[in-house]
Amino acid sequence: MQPDLTLLGKLRSTWASATVNVIHPISLCLSWFLGTIGCSSPLPLRCADLRILLLKKKEFCLLPLFYHLGIFQHLFYPIIPLLAFCFYAPRLVCPAASLEFQRRYVVWILAVSRHIVFLENSYYIMLLHPHHLHHPHPPFLIFLFLILRKLRRNRSVKAQRIMQRSCHRLLFAPVGNDSELSAPSAPSESVVPLRRFNRQSVSTV
């Protein structure tokens, strides 16, 4: 097969070489770094639902999303450092930023990530074309299984509800100082009757 000597062909070959030799290793290292550092350091947020959404829900989480984007084709590689910078910009550039700004910023990043998750699913569904089925690779088979399971359980609606609930709490929650972030949360309803029972037992004795 003769190489394409046109300008577009040269640009394609240069971009593919840079992707394989430079951008792909950087994206993998960046994914590992964000997955390690990001999970070990808590986010500057008070909403517990958002932490669960970011750190435990793998289908809708930002940190595994960097790894998912790492195995994309050449078009999606530049999104990884861009999202990493956008996600950590308030903490790196201005650590003393107001909580309201950080909350609205994270809500915007969550909205962007939701669209990219949609692009991710659309991309792997596009690979179902017969042209791509003659060389299925393990990541494709794994993500095909995850997408089919997600569509079967209808998790997209659930994810949208979780996202709307978390964004609503972030946007309309009262803004406090940093000491409120480390303050213990209010006791749940299941704990209150137990404390009342203990008080009554002590008073009777």
Curated annotation (Swiss-Prot):
It is found in: Mitochondrion membrane. Keywords: Membrane, Mitochondrion, Transmembrane, Transmembrane helix. The chain crosses the membrane at residues 18-38, 69-89, 106-126, 127-147. It is a multi-pass membrane protein. Signal peptide: none annotated. GO terms for cellular component: mitochondrial membrane. The keyword Transmembrane applies. A stretch of 270 kb of the mitochondrial genome is duplicated within the centromere of chromosome 2 resulting in the duplication of the gene. The expression of the duplicated gene is not demonstrated. This is Uncharacterized mitochondrial protein AtMg01260. It comes from Arabidopsis thaliana (Mouse-ear cress).
